[in-house]
Amino acid sequence: MLKELINKLLWHPGYNPEDYVIKYLHRGAENDEKSVPLQNIVIEDSFLFFDETHIPFHRILEIVNLKNGEILYKKR
């Protein structure tokens, strides 16, 4: 489900990847959380890649629309 949502936001013509950010668990960062713009990620198998950073799907905390603050995904 999460992978499908990310693919939809990246590739569906009705969405602009620049409008979304992914918040993920990163131990040692402030509040153990970092954010990455959706437009900067690449999906491969069960990981997201951002520069040299590998982000497993289970570490994704939220996907947020920057324009209106809507949370499209929130980890339970």
From Swiss-Prot:
Q: What is the lineage of its organism?
A: Archaea, Methanobacteriati, Methanobacteriota, Methanomada group, Methanococci
Q: Which HAMAP family match?
A: UPF0248
Question: What Pfam families does its record include?
Answer: MJ1316
The protein depicted here goes by the name: UPF0248 protein MmarC6_0667
Report the family membership.
Answer: Belongs to the UPF0248 family.
Q: Which domain of life is it from?
A: Archaea
